[in-house]
C-alpha cells in the first residue's frame, strides 16, 4: 500500500503557525492510499468499520461514527461492481482518501461547521472523480481528530482504471 500526503494549505502537519495574539493557524489535510489488492481493501475496511481492534479509537465514541454504507461487505461489493472486467496485475483498484483538518481548527467545536466541512469535502471528491466512482464514505469521530474516509474507484474520463491520472 502506497501512501501520499498532500496538504491543502500550509503549514506542514509538523509545524503550526503562531499568529499575532498566540492563535494557532489551522490547516486542511488530505491523504491518499493506493489499494492494489482486495486484501488491502478488506484490511482498510476492517479498520474503518471497526471490525478488528483499533487501539487509537475510543470505543465509547465509536457509535458517533457515520457510514454511507452499512457494512464493509457492501462497500467491497460496490468496488468490485465498478471495476472493469479485466485489470492489470499492478493496478490500483481503489484509492482511500482521508480528509481532515488540524486539531486546532475551531470548527471541530461546532457541529454545523464540522458537517459543512465534510459535506464540501465529499462534493470535492465527487467533482474530481465522478459521483458514481465514490463508492462509500465514513466519518470517524472516535479518534483524536474527526476525519472523513472515502473509497474511490479511480476511473478516468475515458472510462479506464487509472489512478495515475488523479494522483500522479
Residue ranges and their predicted role:
Residues 1-168:
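N-terminal nicking endonuclease/strand-transfer module with a His-rich metal-binding environment
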Amino acid at each position: 500500500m502506497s501512501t501520499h500526503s498532500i496538504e491543502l494549505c500550509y503549514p506542514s502537519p509538523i509545524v503550526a503557525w503562531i499568529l499575532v495574539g498566540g492563535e494557532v493557524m489551522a490547516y486542511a489535510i488530505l491523504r491518499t492510499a493506493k489499494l492494489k489488492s482486495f486484501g488491502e481493501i478488506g484490511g482498510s475496511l476492517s479498520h474503518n468499520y471497526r471490525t478488528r481492534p483499533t487501539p487509537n479509537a475510543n470505543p465509547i465514541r465509536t457509535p458517533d461514527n457515520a457510514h454511507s454504507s452499512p457494512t464493509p461487505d457492501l462497500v467491497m461489493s460496490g468496488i468490485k461492481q465498478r471495476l472493469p472486467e479485466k485489470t492489470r496485475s499492478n493496478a490500483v483498484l481503489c484509492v482511500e482518501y482521508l480528509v481532515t483538518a488540524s486539531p486546532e481548527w475551531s470548527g471541530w467545536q461546532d457541529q454545523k461547521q464540522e458537517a459543512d466541512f465534510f459535506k464540501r469535502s465529499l462534493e470535492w471528491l465527487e467533482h474530481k472523480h465522478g459521483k458514481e466512482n465514490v463508492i462509500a464514505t465514513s466519518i470517524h469521530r472516535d479518534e483524536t481528530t474527526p476525519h472523513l474516509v472515502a473509497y474511490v474507484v479511480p476511473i478516468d474520463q475515458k472510462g479506464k482504471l487509472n489512478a495515475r491520472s488523479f494522483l500522479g
